[in-house]
Curated annotation (Swiss-Prot):
Promotes mitochondrial protein synthesis. May act as a fidelity factor of the translation reaction, by catalyzing a one-codon backward translocation of tRNAs on improperly translocated ribosomes. Binds to mitochondrial ribosomes in a GTP-dependent manner. SUPFAM superfamilies: EF-G C-terminal domain-like, P-loop containing nucleoside triphosphate hydrolases, Translation proteins. This is Translation factor guf1, mitochondrial. Keywords: GTP-binding, Hydrolase, Membrane, Mitochondrion, Mitochondrion inner membrane, Nucleotide-binding, Protein biosynthesis, Transit peptide. It is a peripheral membrane protein. The lineage of its organism: Eukaryota, Fungi, Dikarya, Ascomycota, Pezizomycotina. GTP binds at residues 77-84, 141-145, 195-198. GO terms for molecular function: GTP binding; GTPase activity; mitochondrial ribosome binding. It is an enzyme of class 3 (hydrolase).
Length: 666
């Protein structure tokens, strides 16, 4: 009560002000419109203070550049040929970042810096002055590994050309060939670039000859650079300006915008990377999605420069980011390849074709180490899937490991990187099963069914009788290698059920070998074996081929005749004995001894293909006996033997979870 009286006296004593003056923003505020804001916007600006205020100098320069002086391009190459290092040099050359203090600026994930590879395609806007005129350049740094081909193909949708980068010391490699044909099929203007010309082993002439013979590219305009030292990098940007066409679009048409990528921010929710094809977009505009029909208000627009830098407008031809206010409620609403337009223009604007999402071909099961962390693991997986839509997720449960997920990936590296990101970015402790591939069941009534979970594989004799055939996926693998290792590589491919398709020399010492291989063999550490056979000199690329009839069976691990469902796998019959022996030997190492015998078996149906036994603890029941008391001795040993039989009949084997973790670890 006393507090209320004091407040009333203070209000009476305060100077009287007109009500209108109370609505004026504080003097000196740069943008009065931003004075009143929702709590979401407050959090957004607080979470990224340096980027929330648009740079007036930068905006005025961009506004003065017409669309015919825009250039959208990407860098494509084989893994480890220097794409990210070249991106750094281009950013330094255009003044986007300070020189000398940067290393792989566009590799933003911890796993990318740790492994030295690019996993996510990253974008950056640059301004380059050429012959007295400003050009707006948009650069995409793409991954080189085959597992991230979807990232590369999506990047092409926002580009008019590409720098085709080749290592001067290694020449054309398997993924150089694959990336070339992918870019060529999209109609991109390709500029050949030879990197690492400063190396003692560099042979630029050989690399240029390979590009001319293999790709029929005009190498007269090729640029020879060293991204590490910056040699000749300044010649690249004039070539980009002169060779790569400007994007097509009209700022006066209704908005037509493509969602290229998305990621999650703790405060702002889903942030979308977009390419504007027509019209323009500003904060406050109301948009509608063609895929979901949901309407959103735009909270902020901006460009990557190289980090998020807010702008007042994104125009036709530009690539930038947007987020909504209020934000997207569910991450599934951000569909990669979706078209957005302003509300009211849905019937006028034609949606863009979008992307063909690749199918997951490698499957693993993931379980939390602690069952109480299941919900945290689910949230972590959903957030990472927002940024990588090629991953498939299904819930499943195991008697041994509890509730978990069956995850589908494009390849084994894709799976390994996802596992690292879960641990590094979300602190998840997980158990991952070995990778497996789907199989196709063709029933006698003509129905087809693809299964990726071994638990759904029919084992009942009656059900098996209704199956006409079982098929597994095959791939066509392209291998490049020095000819001195040709014999070993052919032997490796043949032992992995491969069928040779072609063999050609593209130089006097380099061979391109094509093999049709089962995908199951490819995910079983084929790449590691290939590197071992060639001392690291071979490269591998592959593409899906077809489904082929195969003798697929379900291999199970049994502990005292009880199956361990989390470890079951679908394998070719020829691999059963090798894999079964490997399983029982490894599992025996991690199982603690019990008071009774533990029998570990690998079995296909009722047929046991391998067995190991964990001996029980044995109590010395003869310790107190006299050596000459033979009948008493025999009686005690018989009693111990009977007790063991009874214990084995009624006792359950307790396998600690750490045993499964150790067994499933690579």
């Amino acid at each position: 009560m006393r507090g209320c009286l004091q407040l009333a006296r203070w209000l009476r004593a305060a100077p009287k002000c007109p009500a209108a003056s109370l609505l004026k923003p504080p003097s000196g505020l740069a943008n009065p419109a931003r004075f009143f804001t929702t709590s979401t916007a407050c959090w957004a600006s607080r979470s990224r203070a340096p980027a929330s205020q648009p740079s007036s100098d930068l905006e005025s320069r961009i506004a003065a550049i017409p669309i015919d002086r825009y250039r959208n391009f990407c860098i494509v190459a084989h893994v480890d040929h220097g794409k990210s290092t070249l991106s750094d040099r281009l950013l330094e050359l255009t003044g986007t970042i300070q020189p000398g203090m940067n290393k792989q600026v566009l590799d933003k994930l911890d796993v990318e810096r740790e492994r030295g590879i690019t996993v996510k395609a990253q974008t950056c806007t640059m301004i380059y002055n050429h012959n007295g005129e400003d050009y707006l350049l948009h650069l995409v740094d793409t991954p080189g590994h085959v597992d991230f081909r979807a990232e590369v193909s999506r990047s092409y949708a926002s580009c008019g050309g590409a720098l085709l980068l080749v290592d001067a010391s290694q020449g054309i490699q398997a993924q150089t060939v694959a990336n070339f044909y992918l870019a060529f099929s999209q109609g991109l203007e390709l500029i050949p670039v030879i990197n690492k010309v400063d190396l003692p082993s560099a042979d630029p002439e050989r690399a240029l000859d390979q590009m001319e013979q293999s790709f029929e590219l005009d190498t007269e305009s090729a640029v020879l650079v060293s991204a590490k030292t910056g040699l000749n990098v300044q010649q690249l940007l004039p070539t980009v300006v002169e060779k790569i066409p400007a994007p097509v679009g009209d700022v006066n048409n209704p908005l037509r915008m493509l969602l290229v990528d998305s990621w999650y921010d703790s405060y702002r929710g889903v942030i979308c990377l977009v390419r504007v094809f027509d019209g323009e977009i500003r904060a406050g505009d109301q948009l509608v999605s063609f895929a979901t029909g949901i309407k959103y208000f735009v909270g902020e627009v901006g460009i990557m420069y190289p980090n998020e830098t807010a702008q007042s407008v994104l125009r036709a031809g530009q690539v930038g980011y947007i987020f909504f206010n209020p934000g997207m409620k569910r991450s599934k609403e951000a569909k990669i390849g979706d078209t957005y337009t302003k509300v009211g223009f849905e019937k006028v604007v034609e949606p863009l074709p979008g992307f063909e999402e690749p199918k997951a071909m490698v499957f693993v099961a993931a379980y939390p180490v602690d069952a109480d962390h299941f919900e945290h693991l689910e949230d972590s997986i959903n957030q990472l899937c927002l940024n990588d839509r090629s991953i498939t997720v299904q819930k499943e449960s195991s008697h041994a490991l509890g509730a978990g997920f069956r995850l589908g990936f494009l390849g084994t590296l894709h799976c390994s990187v996802f596992e690292d990101r879960l641990r590094q970015e979300h602190g998840a402790s997980i158990i991952i099963t070995p990778p497996s591939v789907p199989v196709k069941l063709i029933w006698k009534d003509g129905k087809e069914e693809i299964i990726s979970n071994p638990a759904k594989f029919p084992e009942d004799e009656e059900l098996r009788g209704k199956i006409s055939e079982i098929q597994e996926p095959y791939v066509v693998a392209t291998l490049t290698l020095p000819d001195e290792y040709l014999g070993k590589v052919i032997e490796l491919c043949e032992s992995n059920r491969g069928v040779q398709k072609s063999l050609e020399y593209f130089t006097s010492t380099q061979v391109i070998l094509k093999y049709e291989l089962p995908l199951a063999q490819l995910v079983d550490d084929f790449f590691g074996k290939l590197k071992g056979s060639t001392k690291g000199y071979a490269t591998l690329d592959y593409e899906e081929s077809a489904w082929q009839t195969s003798n697929i069976v379900k291999l199970q691990l049994l502990v005292n005749k009880a199956p361990v469902d989390a470890v079951a796998r679908l394998v070719h019959y020829s691999q059963v004995e090798r894999l079964g022996r490997q399983w029982v030997t490894k599992f025996k190492e991690h199982v603690d001894r019990q008071l009774f015998e533990i029998v570990i078996q690998a079995a296909v149906g009722r047929k046991v293909v391998a067995r190991e036994t964990v001996k029980p603890y044995r109590k010395d029941v003869l310790a107190k006996l006299h050596a000459s008391d033979v009948s008493r001795r025999r009686k005690l040993l018989e009693k111990q033997k009977e007790g063991r039989k009874k214990l084995r009949a009624v006792g359950n084997v307790v396998i600690e979870q750490k045993a499964f973790q150790a067994f499933l670890a690579k």
